[in-house]
Amino acid sequence: MKKIIFLSSVILAFGCLQLKAQDTNKSESIDPLDISKQMEQIEKYGVPTIATVDEMKTKADVLYESQSWKEAALAYEVYAKNVNWLANLLSQCVEPYYSASYDDRKNTSYSTLKPFIPFESKANECKKQRNIAYVKIGLCYKNTGDMKNAIAYLHKGLDLLSVDELSYWTVAKDAMAEILQFDVEKSK
C-alpha cells in the first residue's frame, strides 16, 4: 500500500513538473515583436478615425430617435466596437508612460507628459461613449422584445458605466427593473 502511495506521489509530482515546463516554454516563445494581434484587430475593425466613428454614432442616434430599434441596435453594436478600438489606439499613444517603472513615471515631468494628455482624455471619452452605446443597445433590444439580448447588453452597460454617468445608470437600472418585474415600492 505504501509503495502504491509513493508511486502515485512520484507520478503526480512528475506530471506537475511537465506542466510547469510546458508553461515555461510557452512564455519563453512569445515574440515581443509579433504584430499579429494588431493586424488581426486592424483586419477586423480597420483603422477608425474620429470622423468615421462620429458618423457611426450619428447614424445610430438617428435610428434610435426614429425608434428603428433593430437597426439602431446593430448600428450601436458596430459603433461600440469601433469606438472601443479607437479608444485602445489612442490609449496606446500613452503606453510608454504606463509601461515605465514606478520610478521612471515619478521622474517624468508634467511638461513631458502634457502633449500626451489629450490622447488619454479622448480615449476616456471614447470609452464613456462605448459604455453609453451598450446601454442603448440594451434598450433597443428591450423595445423589440428580445429580452435575452436586452439583459446581456444592459448588464454589460451597467458593468462598464462609471458612477458619474448617472442618467444612463438610472435608465439602465429602470429598464432592468422593468424586465425583471422588480417594483421598488413593493419591495419596501
Task: Report the location of each language-model feature.
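Acidic, Ser/Thr- and Gly/Pro-rich intrinsically disordered linkers and low-complexity segments
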Residues: 87-125
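Alpha-helical junction/boundary sensor with strong preference for TPR arrays
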Residues: 83-90, 160-164
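Structural signature of alpha-solenoid helical repeat junctions
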Residues: 51-52, 122-129, 168-171
